[in-house]
Amino acid sequence: KLKVNIRKAAREGAELVVLQELHNGLYFCQTEDTSMFDLAETIPGPSTETFGALAKELGIVLVLSLFEKRAPGLYHNTAVVLEKDGTIAGKYRKMHIPDDPAYYEKFYFTPGDLGFEPIDTSVGRLGVLVCWDQWYPEAARLMAMRGAEMLIYPTAIGWESSDTQEEKDR
């Protein structure tokens, strides 16, 4: 379904498509479960190959959000920007990692170490951050000061499973 919708967006004129945080499956950080580490992948890896080929086929810039396995015991929540030719233009590792009820990300992810550097692409200079980074204005400020023309935040936040139906409908 994801590829179908990416193709649809490209057909309708999208030059940049941003996927949600940790898009390869459901957001899994509501619990601490060691079996989830099996979902992590290297960068480059299977997702960057698959979606890189799709970006090249469609001539779009594509922003992925992946559970990165950098080394044994070292994992990140990483956004990867794929250029129109399918190559990796750059990546950003989520810096601010929540540890709140239903957001046990510190169990899974190490804070990023790449700094706040915009990524140059054919659609502009992208300031790519991830989800909870939006609550820390210095991240956006640093990206803007370094020339980001657009801020992008892949996110999985929607509503809490414990919210009332009235709140979800709001």
Task: Map each language-model feature to its residues.
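Active-site catalytic loop in hydrolytic enzyme cores
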Residues: E41, A53, R70-R170
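Cys-nucleophile CN-hydrolase/nitrilase-fold catalytic domain and related Cys-dependent amidase chemistry
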Residues: K3-K84, K91, I157-R170
